[in-house]
């Protein structure tokens, strides 16, 4: 056993989520959830000798060779510069579990569980779980500006949890002090996407709005009506597409956050085609075919399916799935007669093919 004789503790989200589930009367199996471990009294070389693989070079975090779970040496951190990465890390074998837990962001994330199942909770995290409170562990919280976005994301991830008043003061001070501009777009995007997948994504924006945290990275999302996002399935791509933004705002937001092109495409498709497709049985056949071609739906239905999932009406989604999608296969089979195709070249061929497919589609729509 690779962890034999190591002093290890389960920490972070697995412990937090189990305690939350227990309070809600839900069953949870910590062994099957995402788990992180802290190792006390060991060195990096000891873990390497056991076959663990170190992740990166800045932090003493290692992957278990079999489970691929993360094992981190107990460590302390000291601020030495601005931004998310400006820390000196001390992971010597003398760092205690209590010291390690003291560097964490929120009390609910600063609970450890020993091999005997006992909880080590020096900062009252279990009480804050009972009170549904997001509270910082110490004043060192302000040393990492990414924590502003993490707190907002936890508000979205954990329904009913509210930010403690004293933590709200720190968040506002960090935002007003322009600490957020030191973050990388990649880290902000990661928190943004996690929030979009959370049960209450609108809470992410509400918390950031309340602490002046939208202006540097998400100004387009200020004062938007976003509570409807939670009505749709927890897919970040779909929920990004549903943000009530115009094309210019989508482009600006995506460029600032270095968002993947698929997210921009989904938002643009929503603006261009969702209304038309929501009324597809009554749409002019030419307009419908042009939309389907623009979506490349005759070759790949991925973009069309995403638009279908954005629709509020289950009946409409079912009708697209049951009637329009199968119709695409038939539409692809509509081609020009060989003798006519042989006489056409260039744009003329495309126009003629469009004509026969519009005629076919018009007949199919009339028969619905």
Predicted segments — roles?
Residues 1-368:
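Catalytic cores of the polymerase beta-like nucleotidyltransferase superfamily
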